[in-house]
């Protein structure tokens, strides 16, 4: 059992879990482009929406990565910036923004399914990391965990009518 956090987090495990499906999906998309084609998404409006979503996702990913690299080595719980919106903003940017935006742009159900598989892999893999964070930061992490979404970058307090302190 791991006893300390690593810079890669659950990334390597998530890659091992999901990479075979991603590779298979890409092969199927290249060989049979009509397979799981979502024709009802084949419009200019949806494509533009996909590009906007992709821009948001790439911005969120870059900002999250820079923020993480800047503050990880300090050994403190990161709760500001993108980490104030969700506990796993780097994975969020990929699973919630980047891959779904590509699915919209290419009107592909297979690309959407990659996002779903990554989310399932994320849910399977994240528990060990959460345990390490609970052990390392105690009540501070428990409070953070209860006040910030795991992967959807949307402030919970907007629905509760009170701010997070």
Task: Give the ranges of each region predicted by the language model.
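Membrane-anchoring alpha-helices and their flanking helix-loop junctions
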Residues: 1-79, 94-165
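Short, amphipathic, aromatic/basic-enriched membrane-interface segments that mark the entry/exit
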Residues: 78-89
């Amino acid at each position: 059992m791991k006893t300390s956090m690593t810079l890669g987090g659950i990334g390597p495990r998530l890659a091992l879990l999901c990479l075979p499906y991603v590779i298979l999906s890409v092969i199927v998309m290249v060989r049979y482009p009509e397979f799981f084609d979502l024709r009802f998404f084949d419009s200019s409006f949806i494509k533009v929406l996909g590009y906007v979503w992709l821009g948001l996702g790439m911005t969120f990913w870059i900002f999250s990565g820079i923020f993480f690299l800047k503050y990880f080595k300090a050994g403190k719980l990161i709760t500001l910036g993108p980490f104030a919106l969700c506990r796993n903003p780097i994975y969020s940017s990929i699973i919630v923004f980047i891959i779904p935006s590509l699915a919209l742009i290419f009107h592909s159900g297979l690309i959407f399914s990659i996002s779903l598989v990554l989310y399932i892999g994320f849910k399977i893999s994240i528990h060990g990391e959460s345990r390490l964070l609970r052990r390392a930061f105690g009540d501070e992490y428990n409070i953070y965990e209860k006040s910030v979404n795991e992967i959807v970058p949307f402030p919970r307090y907007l629905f509760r009518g009170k701010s997070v302190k």
